[in-house]
């Protein structure tokens, strides 16, 4: 995708926000996966995490490398990395080019599919056959990956801390839709505080 086409994308304004804002705006949107054989799978984004420059948990915290280059955008570029030598995670670059800023898609809810299929970044990438080959690709109507707008009310939004980190552990930069069965890990205390219910 050319820079001009990227700037004309309907997703450019949403993803040009700081990651902490884009992570909220992406909830309820649909991540679209197109396959070469014509198949299309859509998953509703129900959980996200934000990573920004200056955040010690951000992959680009120290510097840009060949491995994390896609995280530096421009907004709308796809950043895929591998963890534990077997699982992949998909992120969408945000805010501005040459800035380490991205949103991790942490859970997707797939229609007519068991919730476990999208409950976690590794699971959803396996279900959608997302791996490092898609790193550096772009969201778009002719690309393997795209976004579609949210088409029904989000429900209750929960804000809490991120998962599986050793740095930046206190930053409340994870958001999820409380009513979704596909959320990877619930924070019952945060739900009690933000929904006004007992634990």
From Swiss-Prot:
Record bears the keyword Iron: no
One function term, GO molecular function aspect: alkylbase DNA N-glycosylase activity
Annotated Pfam families: Pur_DNA_glyco
EC number from the UniProt entry: 3.2.2.-
GO biological process, one term: base-excision repair
Organism domain of life: Bacteria
CDD domains, per database record: AAG
Secretion signal span: none
Keywords: DNA damage, DNA repair, Hydrolase
Top-level EC class as recorded in UniProt: hydrolase
Alphabetized SUPFAM superfamilies for the sequence: FMT C-terminal domain-like
Family affiliation: Belongs to the DNA glycosylase MPG family.
PANTHER family associated with the record: DNA-3-METHYLADENINE GLYCOSYLASE
Protein name from the UniProt record: Putative 3-methyladenine DNA glycosylase
Organism: Synechococcus sp. (strain ATCC 27144 / PCC 6301 / SAUG 1402/1)
């Amino acid at each position: 995708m050319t820079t001009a086409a990227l700037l004309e994308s309907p997703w450019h304004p949403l993803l040009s926000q700081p990651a902490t804002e884009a992570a909220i705006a992406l909830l309820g949107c649909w991540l679209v996966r197109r396959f070469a054989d014509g198949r299309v799978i859509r998953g509703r984004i129900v959980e996200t995490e934000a990573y920004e420059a200056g955040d010690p948990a951000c992959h680009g915290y120290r510097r840009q490398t060949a491995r994390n280059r896609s995280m530096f955008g421009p907004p709308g570029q796809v950043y895929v990395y591998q963890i534990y030598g077997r699982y992949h995670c998909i992120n969408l670059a945000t805010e501005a080019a040459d800035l380490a800023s991205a949103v991790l898609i942490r859970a997707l809810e797939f229609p007519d599919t068991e919730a476990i299929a999208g409950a976690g970044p590794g699971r959803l990438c396996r279900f959608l056959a997302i791996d490092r080959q898609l790193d550096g690709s772009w969201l778009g109507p002719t690309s393997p990956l795209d976004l579609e707008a949210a088409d029904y009310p989000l429900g209750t939004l929960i804000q809490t801390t991120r998962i599986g980190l050793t740095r930046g552990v206190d930053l409340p930069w994870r958001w999820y839709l409380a009513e979704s069965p596909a959320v990877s890990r619930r924070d019952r205390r945060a739900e009690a505080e933000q929904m006004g219910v007992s634990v």
